[in-house]
């Protein structure tokens, strides 16, 4: 029983702190994948640069949670935490005109 508890505790502690992964530049395209996600209030979205840079995340009307610094290297990653319920539109600053836009629904 102690071994099972230790194993389960290790799995729980090793779990990521975010709710969902979003790839920036998925499959070589200027998109967020998935472009629309739903999370609970207080959870984070984990953004991963999946192609050549630069990419960032600008959250409309919420500069306090935006990650405007550019992710310059493939594999670079960061989290954005959404504390309050609502719908949040975000985009990549350099590629918004190309349609690199997404939405986070926070329940």
Q: PLM features: what roles do these ranges have?
A:
Residues 1-5:
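Positively charged n-region of N-terminal signal peptides that target proteins for export
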Residues 6-7, 17:
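Cleavable N-terminal signal peptides
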Residues 17-107:
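Extracytoplasmic copper-binding redox domains, predominantly the cupredoxin/blue-copper superfamily
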